[in-house]
Amino acid sequence: MTITRILTCLLICLFIRIPAAGTKTTQLIFKRFTEETCQNDPCLNGGTCTPGKLSCTCATGWMGRYCHRKCRNIYKSCDRWAVEDKCHTILTQTNFFDVNCAISCKMCSPDPNYVAPEIPLAPALEPMQFFLGKWHSRASKGLRFPTDLYDTEYEEIIDIAPANVPMFGPPSLNFTSTSWFGDDTRVVHGFITLKPNSFPPEVAILSTSNEGLNMIELGTLKHHVLTLNVSYMQVHPTMDSKVLPLGATRRLRRVGSLLEMTVAKLFSENKVSQFKKMFKKIADYAF
């Protein structure tokens, strides 16, 4: 079994685990619009708010609860699902087909002049959309997540991009971190996913690096602040244990146009290393 399959199986087990006795899980539930809601008019791009409805009535070319996205299908199987009458036969059970197959299910009318990006952002991942892009940082010290560099300075690019949606399972974002100075290059590849209908959103990052470290980070997204804890580490025997933390927490949040990452790492003898980095966006992704 490959490392990717192992990490995926671990993620599924963590996300569908049975809650312990006495704990409560909160499910995201959308409330219907009220007269007061419609007075504030949350609908965008010419959409109409109607009391009693769950979403706005969108103008041509737009979709989403608030008409905030261009009208399009998210899944390539939408036309087939529509032929199988998936759009309406299970409408009372889920709104999956309404929001992910809006054109095929005739929930919106596309703009003929709009050229949609090849890879869309799945609606389930919209809480993470403000992290999308390529982010660059230049550090004056070797402090880094998950392991420090031996040099006293380095550069890093974090790339968070939409990924093709799977036929089954939760959608994800591609995640890549590249850090370098001279001949020392550290690369981390992985993906980010959210637990469906969780509130606040439960987030997981599964990653593997060219250092020989595989990780699972679990956390929550609250008020546009993503807090993650390392929940699983698989270490290659040849990896330098001196730079490997026993545990780590990192926090990502937007500060204006910048991305802030705050890290705390725990080492033996209760030694704690803390640092903060600021990233500037150098590229964006349309979705």
UniProtKB/Swiss-Prot annotation:
Residues 34-68 form the EGF-like domain. It comes from the Eukaryota. GO terms for cellular component: plasma membrane. Expressed in hypodermis first at the two-fold stage and throughout the larval stages but not at the adult stage. Detected in the body seams after the L4 stage with expression maintained in adults. Detected in the male tail structural cells at the late L4 stage and also maintained in adults. Detected at different developmental stages in vulva, PQR neurons and several neuronal processes in the head region. It is a single-pass type II membrane protein. Gene3D superfamilies: 2.40.128.20, Laminin. Disulfide bonds join C38-C49, C43-C56, C58-C67. The chain crosses the membrane at residues 1-22. Keywords: Cell membrane, Developmental protein, Disulfide bond, EGF-like domain, Glycoprotein, Membrane, Signal-anchor, Transmembrane, Transmembrane helix. Glycans are attached at N174, N229. Residues 23-287 are extracellular. SMART domains: EGF. Residues 71-108 form the ShKT domain. InterPro entries: Calycin, EGF-like_dom, Nitrobindin, ShKT_dom, THAP4-like_heme-bd. Plays an important role in determining body shape and sensory ray morphology, possibly by acting as a signaling molecule outside the expressing cell. SUPFAM superfamilies: EGF/Laminin, Lipocalins. The EGF-like domain and the SXC (ShKT) domain are essential for the biological activity of the protein. May function as protein interaction domains. Changing C108Y: In allele wx74; hermaphrodites and adult males appear slightly dumpy, with males having swollen bursal rays and much lower mating efficiency than that of wild-type males. Its main location: membrane. It is found in: Cell membrane. This is Protein male abnormal 7.
